[in-house]
């Protein structure tokens, strides 16, 4: 046996050493067989004949480039550019190999003869004739077909075509247009009609398709994948005039935006394309098709100077997990956000292999430099070559650093390299003809740097030009042949700046890679250019501040800023100096006395002295007494005025004996500005204004304000009011209403122009992004930077080429694009207010209308909904002599339709049935006997009076409903006084019988109206409510909605329209109309101020139907409550047509008041089931929710999201490693079942859902707000409310006087880590302030409601800056916050930051339960993402007033205007604007500032007892009986907040109950929140459990005092009526929290 084993081992050794012949033969046989199989496979490749004559080198090049084909080089044709011509056949066949056989295919600009010869009967070629060469090419195609046909005819009869060609030629014979057409691909009308996805190929034709048309054109043809081949040279991206394609002997030549492609051996083949279009195609990744589909470019391969790529259609709605088919897509078009280019160096190297391991250097031609005429270009040079030269010559001393030595060294290393004493060929392939220019350029770079260091080290004080001269002399000594022209040559390099009093050397970056250059060239946002003018901007800001200060302090002075600056420039005088001189004249500090002005007040004297024209003045017009009360006096003279004011009023308006209303909006009234320059029309011609006019326009002597004169008019010449200007209106009440309406139009136009100026002067770098209702159009690029919701606007504000803003009227071409003036326009801005000319045109007409009382007898017909007001108008009106006016076009059209149908003739026309705007703007000569106004209470009272005066009528009938929606003032910084909102009528008629409303709705009407309401409708029950689980269910395919669709908000309306519903309107738009069936839809779950029992919007919504109304809602609210109430009413009661709902009374029981703060220990009793029972009472159903695997379900199911433009990395969709790691953790199972969820795993879906919830789909509720002026007013009110004036002034003086000391204060208290971050920071450049990282909190927030049962809670997001940014700004804002908190009136206001719960309890202990107060709580939903540029302007104004440095303020604002969110973990990138960032250093204190400013602007905090603020929480104690404004409307229209004001019996603040007793208060944490946390599913061990118990015990320590549990019961009942008593629950909670062993029993370890 041993012998056998030995023999076996010997044989193995022999085989291993090759001595065994049998094994060697077997191995040779194996190699032979593999070679045979390989050749057999190669023989199966498609066979191609390369007929052109090419060289042996080219033969190898073609064979290696296309291994997919078996190529036979027949060499039967000799032609020019034979290599390129032969390659076109291979390129087309390579792309057709990618197309599935038989799949319909479009060949864009293709050779249809080649497809015919290949037998492809499924290809359509688009062969447009773009020039004469294309015509000639089509002639050759026809000849080729003729030759082929003749070849098969022959002399002896017809030979049949090959079988595979028969179908293709039969198709060409029967339908040539199916094979080829002469249209460009974008306009091709041919359709395969198969219903299948098509393909497309483009062989060197993609250049001629505009970049923006590629995606839509492919999608219109239902193309799934498009394969394209094209030539390109990276030299074109460097700005080179020539780009060579050496392999095929071709080149690109650049001529402006045209690039010419031609062959060096033959000049007739010459094609011209758009260079800009080629760059866009090369640089971009996404080609949008519509609002859903996008084509993604994927690079395939580069072969013989030809790039191949494919465009793959992607469905952005479906992600990559599922497949769906939609028959049609939305019509609105949007472009995806373009990502930064070439971030991946590997991808970059594949695209442009010649740029691999190379850097860009500036190249100077030595011959031009010697002549003084410098031309700078760029060149790609091997990086090692450049670094070797620079590293070597940098060691030369000054004597050795001459150009000859550098040239000699460069030549030596280029020509040879010595290795071990042997000279070999150089490894660097640098063109020899350019060595001179390369060496000179590198020499110049190093020489400039060394001489710069020398000049600084010498410390010689020389003029700036002397320094440059000195450097030129140094360079002359280093380069022979340089003469005096070297100085001019250095200046032309652009490296030196001698404009100021110093020499600045700006050297280019010598080590810039090709990808870095592309990023800077094509994606940079020009921050360097903006920073270069910072000093100019700062001086300009100072000038405008000084001008503004003079205007505010001294009325009557107007500045033409442009003329003022030109004047200062001409005299070479600092504008600030003249500003101080003017101020000194005003204040009489300059010692200058003007003759003849001694009797005038200082203000007026100074103004008259500075005026260049004559003025009319009245003596003794100085007013010194303050006017502090509102005075209403009818039919009295000006006796209440001072004599000066009375004379002035008489001069201005005559001795008017009518009624007069005087009101003020400010602290005191100063001298009104009564003087004006000649040739200036002042609008409004309304009240006596105490400051400068609101709206004025320079005019000629005989000109007036016309619409035609406004086109291209300077906005700066329309002097807009800055703040709410105090105005005194004179005349009768109707005259005052008319004057107020002109002011309203002026303020509306002023706010619109102000906001449009902000937009048009801002820097926007994106393309077709969305921001509220604004639109911004770049006239140079002919594209929208900000895409408006609707296009076709009537007018806009344009930034002209002279850097002025002007009003323009827009026109459009046939395609709907605006017709622009590229020469004079840079960009223009539009918004929702620029859709029509109504405001401008109304100002034009009404300015010329005399303001007198119309003297019309007005009868108000006040009727309930459906009482037949419109029918009564149609029945009573005399269509020959009377006029009907309506607020909207829909109502006017309805009246015309019904009247013509009733009389069976066109009695109602556009002349006697008109809207208010149309009637005022387009006056006609008709006079009317009577005017009938439908829904007349919806318009401004001044507009109604103007319309009645223009009509010339003697009597008017105003039909309306005082309980329905009134006129809404949408200009938030304009005051529409209460007394002017009242319509003055002579008679009132009432209608209380409704013919529309069913009986159940009539029962509701009786709770609204004081008189009994009856109905004639036979319908008994008509309303019902349906709760939907979420807004995503509201789609036509999922929820069928019958009847007219009505919404409460514009956002819900737009959401339903996007979902696919038609005929949707808001309640405001359909007031006064009637429908058989209606569907009222609420898709917004957050509180809406319009939805309340006494809201007029709810009344309108419930009374539009005659038969049925269904309310679809995502939450239960006041409407569902009303519907539930009317459904309970018995039918027998409804037959009475009138009913009243009894008032529900709550039995009150006096609390037991303890006269001292006692301590009563809790009795620690009970079992954990007590806590479970209490939780289920408060939040029924939450404990039955099985949500452990909701995250898994979401990943496995199809998801459809409504996204704003963003970039998604789909490879991060399934976070497999994190899932595996999470499953390996042993989570304890809680005994208590609450709404707490398991920790989520970050990934694309989770983070995307969180980002949609927290950052996207922002509310758009705000009206027209003058942001700049409104923010100034709010900030002033903020400081006057919370800070005493003397404290604020002391602080500002301290900040400005000792900024270094301020820096030392916060630096001394910083931790070592923060100081270390500052020490390691690279101060050469600024960090990216506008770039934020995004992450999520893994643990979902447990909410104290039942939403967990119907929705998948989104995680909380953290949007944060890098540490280096926080290290700079964190200490600064911390210092400013500390200073602010030290100034707050701590006796009345409490900012819950850096405080303890004990501090909160001590703050409220001043109030007892006996105090006469009411508790208000402002609840705001979507708080962070509702904040816009308005909120940011307020916050920045607060910081600046606290002393924030101007530079830091500018940087901070730049980092918050247009910000980039990047989530590297999930692979998401998107843009947001101004929105609150949840993780930057001002998140908490900034939110606190905003909520405090919001409350202070809406409530009289000067009368409050206490107020506390924390983040988005607020609690205010005010005296009872105060009247408040419409908080919901103000929060919506001004602050863009979905907010609601609650009156509470007990305060609830930051998760704590504020319980007041007889002698103070006690603060209890919310026990329900603590019990909810006991269901925590993220605990991983009992050590973790113990840490959790200690943290809860620290929070709940005040619950161990049971003395006031009876009051806590009442407080909990206020929020949770079904809670029952809470004492036993708190006893049980304290028992478990205080016992480690018992608390441990609340969690089970299933692994044991």
From Swiss-Prot:
Residue ranges annotated for the RdRp catalytic domain, each copy included: 1413-1526
Family: Belongs to the tobamovirus RNA-directed RNA polymerase family.
Natural source organism: Cucumber green mottle mosaic virus (strain watermelon SH) (CGMMV)
GO biological process: DNA-templated transcription; mRNA modification; RNA processing; symbiont-mediated suppression of host innate immune response; viral RNA genome replication
Domain (+)RNA virus helicase C-terminal as annotated: residue spans: 992-1144
SUPFAM superfamilies: DNA/RNA polymerases, P-loop containing nucleoside triphosphate hydrolases
Catalysed reactions, semicolon-separated: RNA(n) + a ribonucleoside 5'-triphosphate = RNA(n+1) + diphosphate; ATP + H2O = ADP + phosphate + H(+)
Residue ranges occupied by any Alphavirus-like MT domain in the UniProt entry: 72-287
EC number: 2.7.7.48, 3.6.4.13
Domain spans labelled (+)RNA virus helicase ATP-binding: 831-991
Pfam families named among the record's database cross-references: RdRP_2 (PF00978), Viral_helicase1 (PF01443), Vmethyltransf (PF01660)
Residue pairs linked by disulfide bridges in the UniProt entry: none
InterPro entries on file: (+)RNA_virus_helicase_core_dom, Alphavirus-like_MT_dom, DNA/RNA_pol_sf, P-loop_NTPase, RNA-dep_RNA_pol_alsuvir, RNA-dir_pol_PSvirus
Protein name: Replicase large subunit
Subunit and interaction comment: Heterodimer of a large and a small subunit.
General function of this protein: The replicase large subunit is an RNA-dependent RNA polymerase active in viral RNA replication.
